[in-house]
C-alpha cells in the first residue's frame, strides 16, 4: 500500500509540474517598422499557446534574421520571401546556402517604398543620380533591393552624392527632415508610420517603379511582384503608385520541436484579428494564404497544422 501511495503521489506531482522551460530568441525588425510591434503580439500569443515557452525579442532585419536562424543565433524570425529564396539558393548577399531555416507562415505584403523630398524633383529611378540617399544597413532586404534598382537603371551608390545607412527608420526620418538626405528607401507596410512622420514635417512623394525595372527584377527572382500604393495612403498623394512588392513571413529553425511550431502556427491562425490590430494588412488572412508555397521548405510542425485544416 505504501508503495502504491508513493507511486500515486509521484504521478500527481509529475502531472502538476510546470512544462519544461523552452527559451527561444525571436528576431524582428528595425525601430519604426511594423515587425517590432507585430513581434510583441506574436510573443504574447505564442507564450500563451505553448506552456513553458519564453521568447526573447530582438531587433533585426530580413536577411540578418534568416542568417541568424541559420547560424543558431535565433530560433524564430520575420523575413522577406524574395531574399529568403535567395538564401535557400545561396545567392548574394548570402555567403552560402541557407540549410537550417524552415517556413512557418506567410503573413502580408511588404512595399518597397522610395520616398523623395518633393523639392528634389525625383520622378523616376533614373533621377536618383547625384542625389543623397538614406537606406538600411548593408545586407538589409531594402538595402539590397536599393542596390539592385540602381544597377538596373545604370547607377550605383557611387552615382549618388551621399549614402547613409541607418538601422532605425526614425534616424532616417530625421536625416530627411533636416535636409541631409533627399531620398529614403524602406520595405514595410503602407502606410508606414515612418513615412507618415516624415510627411507631417516635409512635402514628400513616392517614386514609382517602371515596367522595365519590375520585369527585370521578377525575371531574376519570382518572389518580387508589382503592388499598388493607393492614392490617399499618404498626405498629398493624389495618384496610385506602383511599387516593388514581396511577402513578410515567419521562419523557424528546422530543429525547433515539431509540437512547439504546430501550436505556434495554430495560434496565429486562431488570432488573425489580434495580428491585424497591429498590422492591418493581415486582416482576412486564411490558413491557405499562410500556407502558400514560396519555395522555402515547411517546418514539420507548420506542415502538420496546414494539412489538418486542409490548407496543404
Identify the residue ranges that each predicted region occupies:
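Segments of small-molecule ligand-sensing domains
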Residues: 239-312
Amino acid at each position: 500500500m505504501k508503495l502504491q501511495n508513493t507511486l500515486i503521489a509521484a504521478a500527481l506531482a509529475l502531472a502538476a509540474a510546470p512544462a519544461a522551460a523552452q527559451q527561444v530568441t525571436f528576431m524582428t525588425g528595425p525601430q519604426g517598422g511594423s515587425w517590432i510591434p507585430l513581434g510583441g503580439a506574436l510573443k504574447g500569443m505564442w507564450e500563451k499557446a505553448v506552456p513553458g515557452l519564453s521568447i526573447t525579442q530582438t531587433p533585426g532585419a530580413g536577411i540578418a534574421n534568416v542568417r541568424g536562424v541559420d547560424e543558431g543565433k535565433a530560433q524564430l524570425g520575420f523575413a522577406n520571401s524574395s531574399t529568403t529564396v535567395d538564401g535557400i539558393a545561396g545567392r548574394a548577399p548570402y555567403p552560402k546556402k541557407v540549410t537550417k531555416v524552415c517556413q512557418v507562415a506567410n503573413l502580408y505584403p511588404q512595399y518597397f517604398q522610395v520616398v523623395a523630398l518633393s523639392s528634389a524633383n525625383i520622378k523616376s529611378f533614373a533621377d536618383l543620380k547625384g542625389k543623397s540617399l538614406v537606406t538600411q544597413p548593408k545586407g538589409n532586404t531594402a538595402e539590397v533591393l536599393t542596390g539592385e534598382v540602381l544597377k538596373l537603371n545604370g547607377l550605383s551608390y557611387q552615382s549618388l552624392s551621399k549614402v547613409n545607412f541607418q538601422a532605425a527608420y526614425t534616424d532616417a526620418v530625421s536625416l530627411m527632415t533636416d535636409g541631409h538626405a533627399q531620398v529614403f528607401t524602406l520595405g514595410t507596410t503602407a502606410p508606414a508610420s515612418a513615412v507618415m512622420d516624415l510627411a507631417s514635417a516635409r512635402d514628400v512623394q513616392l517614386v514609382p517603379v517602371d515596367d522595365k525595372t519590375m520585369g527585370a527584377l521578377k525575371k531574376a527572382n519570382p518572389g518580387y511582384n508589382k503592388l499598388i500604393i493607393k492614392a490617399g495612403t499618404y498626405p498629398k498623394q493624389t495618384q496610385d503608385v506602383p511599387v516593388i512588392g514581396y511577402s513578410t513571413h515567419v521562419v523557424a529553425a528546422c530543429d525547433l520541436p515539431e509540437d512547439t511550431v504546430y501550436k505556434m502556427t495554430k495560434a496565429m491562425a486562431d488570432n488573425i484579428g489580434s495580428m491585424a490590430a497591429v498590422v492591418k494588412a493581415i486582416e482576412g488572412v486564411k490558413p491557405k494564404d499562410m500556407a502558400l508555397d514560396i519555395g522555402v521548405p515547411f517546418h514539420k510542425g507548420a506542415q502538420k497544422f496546414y494539412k489538418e485544416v486542409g490548407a496543404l
